[in-house]
Amino acid sequence: MPAIEQEALRLAHGNILDVGGGAGCHSLALQQMGKQVTAIDISPLAVATMRERGVQDALEEDFFTHEGQYDTILMLMNGIGIVGTLKRLPAFFMQVDRLLTPGGEVLCDSSDICYVFEDKDGFIDLTGIDGYYGELTYRMQYKDIKGDPFPWLFIDPDTLTEQARANGFHTEVIARGGHYDYLARITRLKR
């Protein structure tokens, strides 16, 4: 597990929501640390896998409609990517505001994928890019089975900070990885 993810697990506290739990690696690690965690994923197969692997509280739910109160919302492996586009960030922050307890926090990681546009001289050329360069469309495929395309967001730390502030939140980059990746803590601005 990358150092950034290990740091997030160490910092996670109280009642924890693991968003996009996948196969459950983070929830299982949190359980082994004696921490209380609820894992959610929209994939019924992912939830079944988590349960088979021993995740005690795994739910098939969408983050944007999930209800509950959490001290830590964990969004790892570029988990904030579920937002899809910058335009959906206000809805994301509204949901975070509903889910967080007073003093609660989001721990999320992402990558600034500007390096994809870097030329051989190290210049990053974003000319000709329509919209924000971190908004991508993914399509999963296994052998001949293809899923539907879906939007995914890679957000650079400056844009995340600006968007968070515009929606009543503070962002602090608390760790950086070796390849444009970072771990951020998002908390409510003091009102």
Which residues does each PLM region occupy?
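A short glycine-rich, Lys/Arg-flanked "PGG" loop and its adjoining helix->strand segment in the class I
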Residues: L89-P102
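A short SAM/SAH-binding and catalytic strip from SAM-dependent methyltransferases
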Residues: Y70-P90
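Conserved SAM-binding strand-loop segment of SAM-dependent methyltransferases
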Residues: G54-F64
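SAM-dependent methyltransferase
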Residues: T101-E162
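Conserved SAM/SAH-binding beta-strand->alpha-helix loop
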Residues: S43-P44
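Conserved SAM-binding loop of SAM-dependent methyltransferases across substrates and taxa
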Residues: A23-G34
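Core SAM-dependent methyltransferase catalytic element
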Residues: N167-R191
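Conserved alpha-helix/loop element of class I SAM-dependent methyltransferases that forms part
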Residues: M1-N15
